[in-house]
Amino acid sequence: MEDFSLDGNHGHVPVMRDRMAALIAEHVEALGENAVIVDATLGAGGHAEFFLNTFPKARLIGLDRDQNALRDARARLAPFGERFIGVQTRFDGLREVLESVEGDIIDLAREHGIAGALFDLGVSSMQLDQVERGFAYRTDAPLDMRMDATQGITAADILNTYSHGDIARILKTYGDERFAGKIASAVLKEREKEPFTTSARLVELLYDAIPAATRRTGGHPAKRTFQALRVEVNNELDSLKNVLPQITDALNVGGRAVFMSYQSHEDKLVKKFFTDLTTSKTPPGLPVDLPGTAPQFKQVTRGAETASEAEIEENPRAAPVKVRAIERIGNNSGDLS
């Protein structure tokens, strides 16, 4: 989510900013003042600001679970006045927002559906820069990792209370960690001496648990474990699974949803959902689609798009991004009224 390079007063330029706008441009411009865009991972507001400047007639709904990010984004986007509304929620709270929140922009979305939506997944650079949040493994900090600091368990809670099997499963599933079992054993042994509270102790454990040969070639030894803990703390995959049908249901005909994934498990979920949604339900072998079985969506991107070499050179955090976009082409269920 919002992995950035530097940009003037606000510090960051969103990854693939121009391409994200281009993917939704045609339909948003065609709808004019009836166009509602959803930035479901508002972060510092970089993408949202660019969209509002690029599409001067459009309105935008911004979602973020992080109250600090939402506060800063609201201040940044205040010049756009009533064209922007920000709501604190996980992005899989989208349906509830569209059904329950009051406001002119929400009413417009209920009446006309969503013209374009962006999901920039993962942790933001703004969160990484806030040492006390515990997302970064290169600086000693509390093992927190909550995107909404008022809710849920922390990374320390997981390390201090989860079973060996659950810790190993999390590290393997969410971090692709080859040494998940060995790390889990080391965690259980260490927490008997003293509960985990800060990141430096965990990083030291990981250096000891992961073989030297792997440390030399596999990147920072803490990267995969910290990623896995963050995903578990914030229920990131469940949120993604939940929101995929929510946003596609909310799109109007011609509306597009764009997902930026930085981890393989995220991209696999998006890819499978898009494939299922764009495949005819007609039994194989029939020459035409039976009534009611034709797909109501098409994939806009051919496979997953990636950042250009020039962008990666300017902003190395763009290197892993995979972009997929889908468009509603029929059966307008975007009308939520």
UniProtKB/Swiss-Prot annotation:
EC number: 2.1.1.199
Listed Pfam families: Methyltransf_5
Gene Ontology molecular function: rRNA (cytosine-N4-)-methyltransferase activity
Compartment list: Cytoplasm
Cellular component terms (Gene Ontology): cytoplasm
Keyword ATP-binding: no
Major place of residence: cytoplasm
Keyword presence, Transferase: yes
Annotated catalysed reactions: cytidine(1402) in 16S rRNA + S-adenosyl-L-methionine = N(4)-methylcytidine(1402) in 16S rRNA + S-adenosyl-L-homocysteine + H(+)
PANTHER family attached to this UniProt entry: 12S RRNA N4-METHYLCYTIDINE METHYLTRANSFERASE (PTHR11265:SF0), S-ADENOSYL-METHYLTRANSFERASE MRAW (PTHR11265)
Family: Belongs to the methyltransferase superfamily. RsmH family.
Protein name per UniProt: Ribosomal RNA small subunit methyltransferase H
Species the sequence originates in: Corynebacterium glutamicum (strain ATCC 13032 / DSM 20300 / JCM 1318 / BCRC 11384 / CCUG 27702 / LMG 3730 / NBRC 12168 / NCIMB 10025 / NRRL B-2784 / 534)
